[in-house]
Amino acid sequence: MAFTPFPPRQPTASARLPLTLMTLDDWALATITGADSEKYMQGQVTADVSQMTENQHLLAAHCDAKGKMWSNLRLFRDGDGFAWIERRSVREPQLTELKKYAVFSKVTIAPDDERVLLGVAGFQARAALANLFSELPSREKQVVKEGATTLLWFEHPAERFLIVTDEATANMLTDKLRGEAELNNSQQWLALNIEAGFPVIDAANSGQFIPQATNLQALGGISFKKGCYTGQEMVARAKFRGANKRALWLLAGSASRLPEAGEDLELKMGENWRRTGTVLAAVKLEDGQVVVQVVMNNDMEPDSIFRVRDDANTLHIEPLPYSLEE
């Protein structure tokens, strides 16, 4: 990608975030084009893509035959097919898996590093973009296309926008916003995704979890009414037989070091500590607070105390902006 990522600043929680323009270099874009695109994706991901309109984007999982996620994808219609955004660390293996049956279909599946991914969030983000685009996405119309640019709208943790565009437009946006917006890299967007409870699947956790263990059903990412897709039997069993005992949680507090993706944490049990969970992502905010996204048992007590392994500091459960009730 020729567009240079912005230098990192310590991320800020959404409630205190000034207007910020971010380069999303830790995320990556991929596309499927061709006459069979919709049919092909319908057989590969958990969401019902046949029901998607041009004005929607949705979270979906791409699973293996056992229902474990290679990756989760932020999907939207693009040209005569679809595009999706996922963590850069999983794109190559995810595309390798997705292409396995493509030889029998009229599709072309490819990474897209020509386009640039930007995020805009923080104080009066909508007003800042309203001067630059003739229409902005909203709850009713979550995807808007203008020229070479696609804008995606997100409600949580506070209104924000993901921009998929060409290099020239990315440079124009940077020039226009440079004076009024802080510039940051993808760690800020990661912090917002953690706060929003959007699961972050990096390479360390690819192939480890069924979608429901990361709350995908609560985020509208699983259709239980659509036809067959890879891993469907296991995903359905988890719902209808109550086989899933895990959920994605948001923890906040202090830690002397950031836990890495794939690491476990420790849960306080009386005077002792017991290993628990799997970390998906963690970020240290500018106020010193550490936020951690972790998959753990879904019956944790709300007042449970956790820590990074052998650490002197503690973490506690924070509420997510959505309900886990089906």
Curated annotation (Swiss-Prot):
Biological function: Folate-binding protein involved in regulating the level of ATP-DnaA and in the modification of some tRNAs. It is probably a key factor in regulatory networks that act via tRNA modification, such as initiation of chromosomal replication.
Localization, UniProt: Cytoplasm
GO biological process: iron-sulfur cluster assembly; RNA modification; tRNA processing
UniProtKB keywords: Cytoplasm, Folate-binding, tRNA processing
Annotated positions binding folate: 27, 189
InterPro entries in the cross-refs: GCV_T_N, GcvT/YgfZ_C, tRNA-modifying_YgfZ, YgfZ/GcvT, YgfZ/GcvT_CS, YgfZ_barrel
Name by which UniProt lists this protein: tRNA-modifying protein YgfZ
Keyword flag Membrane: no
Coarse class of the protein's main subcellular location: cytoplasm
SUPFAM superfamilies assigned: Aminomethyltransferase beta-barrel domain, Folate-binding domain
NCBIfam families attached to this UniProt entry: PRK09559.1, ygfZ_signature
